[in-house]
Amino acid sequence: MALPWVPQPASAAPATSSKAKPATATSKAKPASATKPAKKDSAAAPSAGPATAGTGQALKLGQFEDWIAYSTPGARKICYALSVPKERLPKNLNRDPGYLFVSYRPDEKVRGEIAVVMGFAVKEDAPAQAVLGSTTFQLAGKDSSLFVHNAAEEGTMLAAMKKSASLVIKASSKRGNATTDRYSLAGIAQALDQAEKACK
């Protein structure tokens, strides 16, 4: 499933703070050693702009700690909240930026769809998981993205995300590399509230 509304990396990343800095979209993971070349997985890069085709640039609704809410103009309105990983492992794996999205698409009757852009082609037949404390949700891979395997669990997962401090995404690349991305959930409740209101 494509994510045509993926924002431009430079404008999408939440601002860094004096605490742990989220990965900026213009930087790539650096090799662990200067003498050891980084491995690179083939990846489908995020689309050039933050809106669907023909709708123009997305409007930033607000930044809430580590999350940003956006909406797109045009007839087919899309609203979403996003964040970038605080930590990506293994550090020596060179890949494109990653994002965690929650989207609202009224024309498609979609509300609160969770999606993760991994920054590399995922191994679609391998297990992928979203871990919130002691609770684990199974994910399904498609191209370079992950979605909740059982869509009926999205509401439960969103409720858990609003109450948790962080979310860990575990997945394997098409080349077989096991990866772990950690996202901060600080500000997600407010960002989701803004995105949902904008797409009522």
Write out the residue ranges for each language-model feature:
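A generic "folded-domain core" signal
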Residues: 5-200
